[in-house]
A protein has these predicted regions:
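Membrane interfacial helix motifs at helix-loop boundaries and amphipathic/re-entrant anchors
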Residues: 39-55, 110-136, 185-186, 224-244
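Hydrophobic residues within alpha-helical transmembrane segments
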Residues: 99, 173-177, 189, 213, ...
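Juxtamembrane helix-loop-helix connectors linking adjacent transmembrane helices
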Residues: 51, 80-151, 158-159, 163, ...
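Alpha-helical transmembrane segments and their helix-entry boundary regions
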Residues: 52, 83, 93-94, 156, ...
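Membrane-interface helix/loop boundary segments of multi-pass membrane proteins
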Residues: 148-173, 200-207
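Short, Lys/Arg-rich, polar N-terminal cytosolic tail immediately upstream
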Residues: 1-21
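Alpha-helical transmembrane segments in multi-pass membrane proteins
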Residues: 27-74, 92-97, 243-245
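C-terminal membrane module of polytopic membrane proteins
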Residues: 216-269
Length: 269
């Protein structure tokens, strides 16, 4: 039981996290390094026709394997599933995920405009999303990245950093790694901001499940709107950019606020 006079350590500051569920920061660094190294090798060696799915699979297979092996060799509190961040958090984190995932994609459109992105880079990204069917695009570029990338960058890295570091510092470091992993100027700033917000949720929730939802929804909305699958919505956004921007900012701020608010203080009886 926590005393009101107990010093605010990092674990108390983040509160809500199940003690011992995240992996040790040094182990997390090793897992992320091994995962990204394997990812680069696969991206170079695998045929382009399957490189997206193969490279994404690495982001899930390597961390899962590493955590399972480490738990067998060095028993630690909690299960491997909890260590990966695959535990159910309070419902408010899923509400936050919906609020953030549904609107952050629109805010990031304005951030992309600030970057030195060439027309060719924009065209390549657009063709990548437009070429497959809508269902295939949603699976390849929304569902799969949401699960695989969140597992390593939020389930492993962000939660591990959240143990010794303050919330904003841990979220900032993990977001920077996530942004660098993209290897794309066009995606650098949007993924940095998205990664920071998702890390806040993952650390507070001690779970990657809500961030998977937010990530999948963010990507799905970007894909659907980029392909003009919802012409009425696209037309409204084009005619009311200020209202859309204000609404998106408010929704994202709401999601962040309910994610980072401190839980009720435990009073000794």
């Amino acid at each position: 039981m926590t005393s009101p006079n107990e010093p605010r350590t990092a674990s108390l500051y983040h509160a809500g996290a199940a003690a011992g569920s995240a992996v040790d920061p040094s182990l997390a660094a090793a897992i992320v390094t091994a995962t990204l190294a394997t990812y680069l090798v696969v991206a170079v060696l695998v045929p382009r026709s399957v490189v997206v799915m193969a490279a994404q699979a690495v982001l899930a297979v390597v961390p899962i394997t590493a955590v399972v092996i480490s738990r067998r060799r060095m028993p630690a509190p909690g299960t491997a599933r909890a260590a990966l961040g695959l535990r159910l958090p309070p419902r408010r984190f899923f509400v936050a995920a919906l609020a953030i995932g549904a609107t952050t994609w629109y805010l990031n459109m304005y951030l992309v405009a600030l970057l030195p992105v060439t027309e060719r880079q924009v065209r390549v990204l657009a063709e990548l999303v437009d070429r497959p069917s809508l269902a295939a695009a949603l699976v390849m570029f929304a569902l799969v990245p949401a699960v695989c990338e969140e597992l390593v960058f939020r389930g492993i890295l962000a939660r591990a950093l959240g143990r010794p570091l303050r919330l904003a510092v841990a979220a900032g470091i993990s977001a920077a790694v996530f942004s660098a992993y993209q290897l794309s100027i066009a995606q650098a700033l949007p993924t940095l901001t998205l990664g920071f917000v998702l890390a806040l949720i993952a650390i507070r929730a001690d779970s990657a499940l809500p961030t998977m939802l937010a990530h999948a929804l963010n990507n799905a909305m970007a894909i659907v709107m980029s392909r003009d699958e919802l012409p009425a919505a696209s037309d409204w956004l084009a005619r009311h950019p200020a209202a859309a921007l204000l609404g998106g900012a408010a929704s994202t701020a709401f999601g962040i606020a309910i994610s980072v608010r401190r839980p009720d203080r435990i009073v000794p009886t």
